[in-house]
Every structure is written in structure tokens, then in C-alpha cells.
């Protein structure tokens, strides 16, 4: 018969199990218990005793477990960061100067990275079968095009009465400067409902957008700038901005409710 004794060590607890003459240790989070010693009987009825576990020994066990976990996570992050589909491009991470991408052209003339083409087509077809008509509003952009969009947004803000500094700061909440836009990777598509092609807050109320947000991970996409994560992504919530990361990563990120920055620990 096994009996367990829990020994508190700050925020960690060592569980000691006696099986016959053997002693086993387990670790779990705990608070408030003090070290104890005890005695018990094994299956033969023979009296036995547990030597008191010292705080140093228990701490070493906890530290070993923590180091093992940290090492394993470091390896996972290293592999994730090597994955080209998980390339992080944001306000703090520029697109590599030597970045190149093979493009595929959609029927409407937009271009996307070849690697995402099939899954994108499958997602749009599935949306159509579900009764929703989805339009690609934007996809791959050259650096020149990205800069044009930023300047247009700044001019619009100036027209609306903002100072130059205010206009630039406001524009950067929604439009990235060239070299720092995910659209330059070819992995991004802005998708809108055919009956509402506005890139604003009304988009998330459309049936098409609701379907996309619920199902995009099945096809390797994530909602890149989710609501409530603005301080992490650096951008305002965009219900139409979908980023391809591959099916496995999309599934994990959706289940864990994390952004690409969090997934890569960047």
C-alpha cells in the first residue's frame, strides 16, 4: 500500500511516496505546509520510517524540474523561430533585407505567397459552401505600395485637422511603415464580406467575418491583430487581417489564445 506525505517548500511541494522499502518524490505547486517526518508500515506489516527531507534536497529537486522545463521550452522556441511561416514582422522586427517570396496570383489579380495559395483557396471555398461570399481586399504588397498607403493615411489625418506629429502617430496604429508590414511577406490577406467591404468595426458583425474568425485556424490562418492584444501586437484590432502560419501552429495559437509575438516569446 502506498502512502503519500506532502512536504511544503515555499511555493513548491514535494510528495513522498513509500512503496515497500522505496521512496519516490513528486513535485507540485503548493504553499503553507511545513516539513514533517512520519512512519508507516509496508505491505508485510514491517515498521519503516521516512528520513526527513531537507529543504536543500527539496529545493534541488524543484530547481532541476524547473531547469528541465526551461530547457525544453527553449528548444521549442528555437524550432518555432526557424520556421519561415512564423516569420515575425512588426514595429520592432523588420522584414529581412534579403527577403524573397515566390508569389501566386489570384483570379482577382491579388498576389499571395505560393505556400499559402492552396489553403487560402480551400478556406474561401469552404466559406462559400457555408453560404458566405468573401472578397480579398488586400494581400501581398511591395515596399513602395506600403509606403504609399502610409502617406495616404497621414495626409487624410492632416486633412481632418491633426498636426503632422499626431497624423503620423495615428496612421501608424493601422498602417505599418514599409519594411515592417506583414503584407510584404505574402502570408497575409485582408478578407471582407461581399456585402460589406469596409475595413472598419462593422466588418466583425458580418456573417462572413464571424465564420472566418471561427474557422480560419483549420486552414492555417490566425486573426493576427485580435481584440485585447493591442499592447502586444502594437496595432489596433483588425477583424479582417488574417495571417498564414501553417495548420499546426494556427491550431496551437488558437487553443492557447496567443498572438504570434506570444507564441514566439518575442
Task: For every predicted segment, state its role.
Residues 2-266:
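Extracytoplasmic cell-surface/polysaccharide-interacting catalytic and binding patches
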